[in-house]
């Protein structure tokens, strides 16, 4: 036989049932027991889906009310002491307070789960952190699954990855020092799972796919020797998100009973493990993307493995399926509008079925599933030959770009003189990042237009009214470079995706970002082309309302790529450059329309960095090229801005400088301008606008706070190159606090201008 299992399942439900229940509970509209009952029903459905597909185990312990790393903090007694909670007697309300904060304590920090778009809650480790086992979360889920008659495989993140994902707080120390006292707590937790009947336990160690310091890598041997010796269960060590070839010798000698490899992200690593003499779980179905697999091609890899390994071969998705939407079958609109694309997709339930087919083929031969294999082949062939996907003119345009197409005509020093001559801006010019408050009226108008209750003319008139309001308010505030406020945009990526060829949208393709927040990424399925102007009329209309300078607003190619499900039949770098070239048509049209300050937002550029530093240069080279291509051909006196959200820039500053944007605005207020110091040390050559207040809070900053930040900025950036702006877009704020915040920003700026004049 061939064992088939999954590493984890989506938690939120087919139609985001958990999200809506959580939010009703937080608003006190749903009783705790009702939330618990709904969660139990979702878990039971998840297990049934796995069992119905003939999975040999169901994954348990992967379900969470907010985040699996928060659950692990509770299970190891490592919740932040500052909350004053007892992890053994933690209430559901207290659990949510850890994630969302309360009146006395800010929430646990959140950051990206490796290089995915999921966010986990970062463990806070102190030198005196005391771990205590509390396996209730896992034990209860095992009991539920066993009552329902399932064979269980508990899933838990391993001790080294858990420590790796945390941060040291307080007194200076290295969190690695806590490993010795964490391991016995893991032993206790795992033995509690064994006591409930767990025969196999999956321990996730994705940290093996990053650049681990030597002492961390070396620690695996002793840690797993201890776990293996003291826990009477078979241990499956799961790695994913990248290659672990560099650890092959260590992993083959590790005291575990099986190893899971991500053969989608890193198929080449299989060679290093072909002589592995224990269970090898082959992650052959993509757990991070939505494309249907060519099952014949997958079997070409698996059949020789099966011959070699026999029953020691397990099959699985590459990683947890929490990164994929739930069920393609509910996408009836997509099936109707684009049946070809629909036939190329696989969501979680379809991926589980693909694994079921592979299991049967390995056990009984391909003929036993020839109908399914033929359907898979037909879809793969149709996709490979589709004229809707492959547009020769796009490949031709990319191939025939002029030499140095991604370079501006003149260096920044010459461009800025031409720009300053016509812009005629005061010292410390002010602007905002782009969006203004998206009011209930705006959202209602958009929803009514989408439903057909509002005509195109009525909708556009309501958007024009909003734009006029935004322009007039900025004029009253005396901002220098204005924006139109983006009332017509529901989302900074979706808006452009809807207007570019090569993109499609699902109705229920939601994936969890964090807690109750879900995102519905666009699908980039074909060559990207801009059929007509996307933003020009809105910016042109806004400019017609004012004599002040109006800034055009676009989302950059790297961010569009990062926040989408991306086609997997050509390199990501090629897709990114296609988007950049398509955007360049928009930039040139804006320029022709008289919009000569254009912002190309790239909040996600750092997110795209590969897990291993050795791969950074390649990524940064093509990401930078794609960004520069998006403004190719603009005149020297057109000013290109970019905006980047809260990031550590120190290690990629040369690449940021190489983007060669005339002005970069960055989110810095929460770090007290610390991020800006790196730009100063690096001697960043172009103009900079560090955010002077945090837009994520409705709080109105004091004049003293903004002045403090601006003076710090002036210590780092020459006054001639310093812009003044909020941290980020103002979409999520209300009008009253927006005006109040900008008034303070303007009054401080004017005070400093007078002083510096």
Curated annotation (Swiss-Prot):
Sequence similarity: Belongs to the vitamin-B12 independent methionine synthase family.
BP GO annotations: methionine biosynthetic process; methylation
Cofactor binding note from Swiss-Prot or TrEMBL: Binds 1 zinc ion per subunit.
Protein name as annotated: 5-methyltetrahydropteroyltriglutamate--homocysteine methyltransferase
Named cofactor requirement(s): Zn(2+)
Protein residues bound to L-methionine: 433-435, 486, 601
Residues reported in the UniProt entry to bind Zn(2+): 643, 645, 667, 728
Catalytic-site annotation from UniProt: 696
């Amino acid at each position: 036989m061939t064992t088939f299992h999954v590493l984890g399942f989506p938690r939120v439900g087919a139609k985001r049932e958990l999200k809506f229940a959580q939010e009703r509970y937080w608003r006190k509209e749903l009783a705790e027991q009702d939330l618990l009952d709904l969660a139990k029903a979702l878990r039971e459905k998840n297990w049934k889906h796995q069992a119905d597909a003939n999975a040999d185990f169901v994954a348990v312990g992967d379900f969470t009310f907010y985040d699996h790393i928060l659950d692990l903090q509770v299970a190891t007694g490592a919740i932040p002491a500052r909350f004053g909670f007892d992890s053994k007697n933690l209430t559901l309300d207290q659990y949510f307070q850890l994630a969302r904060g309360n009146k006395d304590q800010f929430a646990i920090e959140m950051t990206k789960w490796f290089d995915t778009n999921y966010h986990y809650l970062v463990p806070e480790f102190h030198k005196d952190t005391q771990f205590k086992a509390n396996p209730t979360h896992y034990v209860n889920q095992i009991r539920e699954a066993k009552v329902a008659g399932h064979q269980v495989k508990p899933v838990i993140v391993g001790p080294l990855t858990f420590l790796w994902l945390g941060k040291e707080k307080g007194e200076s120390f290295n969190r690695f020092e806590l490993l010795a006292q964490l391991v016995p707590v893991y032993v206790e937790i795992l033995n509690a799972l064994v006591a409930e009947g767990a025969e196999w336990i999956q321990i996730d160690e994705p940290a093996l796919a990053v650049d681990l310091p030597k002492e961390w890598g070396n620690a695996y041997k002793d840690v797993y020797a201890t776990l293996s010796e003291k826990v009477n269960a078979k241990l499956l060590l799961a790695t994913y998100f990248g290659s672990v070839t560099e650890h092959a010798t260590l992993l083959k000698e590790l005291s575990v009973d099986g190893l899971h490899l991500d053969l989608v992200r890193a198929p080449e690593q299989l060679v290093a493990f072909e002589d592995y003499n224990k269970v090898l779980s082959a992650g052959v179905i993509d757990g991070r993307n939505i494309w249907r697999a060519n099952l014949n091609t997958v079997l070409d890899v698996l059949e020789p493995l099966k011959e070699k390994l026999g029953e020691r071969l397990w099959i699985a998705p590459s990683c947890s399926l929490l990164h994929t939407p739930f069920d393609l079958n509910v996408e009836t609109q997509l099936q109707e509008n684009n049946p070809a694309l629909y036939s190329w997709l696989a969501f979680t339930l379809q991926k589980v079925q693909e694994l079921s087919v592979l299991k049967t083929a390995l056990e009984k031969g391909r003929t036993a599933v020839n109908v399914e294999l033929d359907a898979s082949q037909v879809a793969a062939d149709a996709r490979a030959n589709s004229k809707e996907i492959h547009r020769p003119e796009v490949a031709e345009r990319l191939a025939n770009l002029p030499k140095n197409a991604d370079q501006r005509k003149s260096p920044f020093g010459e461009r800025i003189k031409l720009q300053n001559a016509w812009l005629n801006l005061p010292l410390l010019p002010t602007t905002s990042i782009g969006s203004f408050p998206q009011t209930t009226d705006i959202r209602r108008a958009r929803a009514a237009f989408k439903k057909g209750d509002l005509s195109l003319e009525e909708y556009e008139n309501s958007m024009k009214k909003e734009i006029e309001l935004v322009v007039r308010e900025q004029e009253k505030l005396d901002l220098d470079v204005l924006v139109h406020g983006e009332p017509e945009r529901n989302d900074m990526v979706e808006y452009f995706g809807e207007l570019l060829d090569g993109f499609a949208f699902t109705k229920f393709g939601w994936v969890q970002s964090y807690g109750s927040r879900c995102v519905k990424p666009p699908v980039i399925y074909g060559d990207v082309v801009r059929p007509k102007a996307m933003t020009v009329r809105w910016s042109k209309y806004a400019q017609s309302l004012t004599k002040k300078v109006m800034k055009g607003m676009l989302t950059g190619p790297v961010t569009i790529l990062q926040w989408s499900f991306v086609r997997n039949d050509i390199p990501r770098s090629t897709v990114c450059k296609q988007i950049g070239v398509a955007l360049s048509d928009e930039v040139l049209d804006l320029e022709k329309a008289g919009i000569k300050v254009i912002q190309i937002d790239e909040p996600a550029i750092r997110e795209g960095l590969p897990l291993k530093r050795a791969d950074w240069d390649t990524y940064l080279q093509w990401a930078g090229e794609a960004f520069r291509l998006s403004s190719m051909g603009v005149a020297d006196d057109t000013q290109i801005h970019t905006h980047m959200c809260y990031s550590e820039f120190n290690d990629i500053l040369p690449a940021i400088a190489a983007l060669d944007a005339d002005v970069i605005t960055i989110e810095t207020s929460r770090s007290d301008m610390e991020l800006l110091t790196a730009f100063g040390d690096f001697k960043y050559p172009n103009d900079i606008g560090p955010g002077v207040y945090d837009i994520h809070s409705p709080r109105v900053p004091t004049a003293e706070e903004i002045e403090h930040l601006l003076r710090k900025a002036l210590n780092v950036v020459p006054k001639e190159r310093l812009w003044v702006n909020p941290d980020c877009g103002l979409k999520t704020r209300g009008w009253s606090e927006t005006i109040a915040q900008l008034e303070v920003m303007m009054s401080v700026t004017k005070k400093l201008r007078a002083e510096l004049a």
